[in-house]
Amino acid sequence: MELRPWLLWVVAATGTLVLLAADAQGQKVFTNTWAVRIPGGPAVANSVARKHGFLNLGQIFGDYYHFWHRGVTKRSLSPHRPRHSRLQREPQVQWLEQQVAKRRTKRDVYQEPTDPKFPQQWYLSGVTQRDLNVKAAWAQGYTGHGIVVSILDDGIEKNHPDLAGNYDPGASFDVNDQDPDPQPRYTQMNDNRHGTRCAGEVAAVANNGVCGVGVAYNARIGGVRMLDGEVTDAVEARSLGLNPNHIHIYSASWGPEDDGKTVDGPARLAEEAFFRGVSQGRGGLGSIFVWASGNGGREHDSCNCDGYTNSIYTLSISSATQFGNVPWYSEACSSTLATTYSSGNQNEKQIVTTDLRQKCTESHTGTSASAPLAAGIIALTLEANKNLTWRDMQHLVVQTSKPAHLNANDWATNGVGRKVSHSYGYGLLDAGAMVALAQNWTTVAPQRKCIIDILTEPKDIGKRLEVRKTVTACLGEPNHITRLEHAQARLTLSYNRRGDLAIHLVSPMGTRSTLLAARPHDYSADGFNDWAFMTTHSWDEDPSGEWVLEIENTSEANNYGTLTKFTLVLYGTAPEGLPVPPESSGCKTLTSSQACVVCEEGFSLHQKSCVQHCPPGFAPQVLDTHYSTENDVETIRASVCAPCHASCATCQGPALTDCLSCPSHASLDPVEQTCSRQSQSSRESPPQQQPPRLPPEVEAGQRLRAGLLPSHLPEVVAGLSCAFIVLVFVTVFLVLQLRSGFSFRGVKVYTMDRGLISYKGLPPEAWQEECPSDSEEDEGRGERTAFIKDQSAL
């Protein structure tokens, strides 16, 4: 019995070698698809296909259709005559042919770019393998062709000689000035050069004798001018939602202040733009948002306090120096997914790219330079497989990133054997590995979301608090998860000095994520209000079992606070089973890559599969959807599972007012069908028993005291405080006047009729601030009169 797997492996390997040898010798290799001519329209073709166990992949043109059969070997040296004969005997079939695999090669001849600065782009062409392996992707023929990237920043110099050839006006807009032109505003200090620099990293034109090359040098590049003015929630949302069925990738190298004390993230509109982007962008495959993790390392900042990099919808990218070290500006956190190269110390090279005023620079720096490099690599990967979803891309990053050559003292092995670091995520992006894996990638199962309320009552944090909870990851429910992607700890807590807190989350498989490290500059007493700390470190782990939350006071001070809410939110996928046969999946029309685009009646499209019931968090809706053919993008109307509004748990539609149920932290308004978040102050107290009635005279006394104390005590205290301050001021004033020889006779302290304050009884030299005193007595008098002037001004 032990030999059977080996025998199967040997047989499979032998068959593969035979096919390869036959292909090399020019023999025909038959596939499991047929081209069939059937007059009468798609309905007749579908009927014939179903009758004989075929699936109609769609109309080729005219009366010609593309049939597929799952029971036929995908590649064979001989045709499948029984299936062919039965189909041929069908009277509606006028012609058919089993399709033969043909050898086709791209006519690109790969040569290294000839641009003058290319040899200095060490991160693309490293001689010691310390690079992003981009040339391996280029050698496979992928240069970003057909992919559109937009830089959300301070504009893009669209007429730059190294950008103009790839500039895409459809991926550009000026949100600051409300016009289509993203040209940056020029200043003497070149303040608005950031976006142009980022754009060159992605798609600088190759072999034009100018500067260097972009990672995806045949991609289309655009820019959104949105940072050169007031940045509001509306500005961010408009930028994130620009032309989502044209733009594939959005690259952003900005965020809240990296000062080590700010906790901030996207507001309502921007959060909605993210959600709409991943659920509706790219025809439902999801927009890809690439984000720089932050430059607050010197301030001991944490990128988990940045709600943009901490979002499950963004692909957060950190930096490594030329020699593979953690840069001084880098922030460590558990939401970072991967790393690219950037600047480091003075003896390490920086990034070469386009610069403002049609120039070139060799000194682009920070995580601002890392995110565009990642966007370029993702563009190469999308060219290899345009059907990748936004979550597919994150899976590819996790599976192909390389920890090698990166130095850090916190590398750990998670529960599925992958190395992961808070400084680097899963390691350096590998462009060659990503495009190779993407070509035959199978779309991940639909995302599931499991919400678990952990706390039943508030808990005192003290010096150290540990909360343990064993969970089943929604076992027995439609949203049961067995393979984890993102995990969030949504915390509400109070603390007198937030920066002294360190928070960790330990998964059932033992992976310990640092959700928050101590931030010495954060003196805030605001705590956290339903803040979602996110970790990617347990990717692909089984989330069932005991989770442990650790909250620790890292200082010696006797700090105090209370944890009032802890919700564990798990995102992942269902158990992997056998693939559903396409004939019984409810799919009506597939693309050439066998991705479903139209479902039969009674089914809705969800993540390229047809389902009779949309999963929790989605509702059926008829929408215009887009899918890519070989040469174009087609628009069709189809029933799809549209995501609920971000505030709803379940819904009957995508609008804010379509909620059917709410998350645990919100309540449903049955009239407006909206979910409103509950605050601590708005929650009703439990009913209490009525106290026994007191005698009338006692009750009257209590009413008298209650009427005086609760309602008037603040006013009384405020009045007494003001009177005391005035008394102290008058006393000090009089004492100083007496010490100065002040006389009360004939004093006129001030006049207000001309808006002036004139002092009497003071020597004239007291007002001559520029004149030096002739004696210590005059100096003392000058100090005192200065004090009086200050107090009078008050």
UniProtKB/Swiss-Prot annotation:
GO terms for molecular function: endopeptidase activator activity; endopeptidase activity; heparan sulfate binding; heparin binding; metal ion binding; nerve growth factor binding; peptidase activity; peptide binding. Ca(2+) 1 binds at residues 115, 162, 205, 208, 210, 212. One of its GO terms (cellular component) is trans-Golgi network transport vesicle. Residues 739-794 are cytoplasmic. It is found in: Golgi apparatus, trans-Golgi network membrane; Cell membrane; Secreted; Endosome membrane. Seems to be expressed ubiquitously. The record marks 107-108 as: Cleavage, first. It holds the Pfam family Peptidase_S8. Binds 3 calcium ions per subunit. This is Furin. It comes from Homo sapiens. The gene is FURIN.
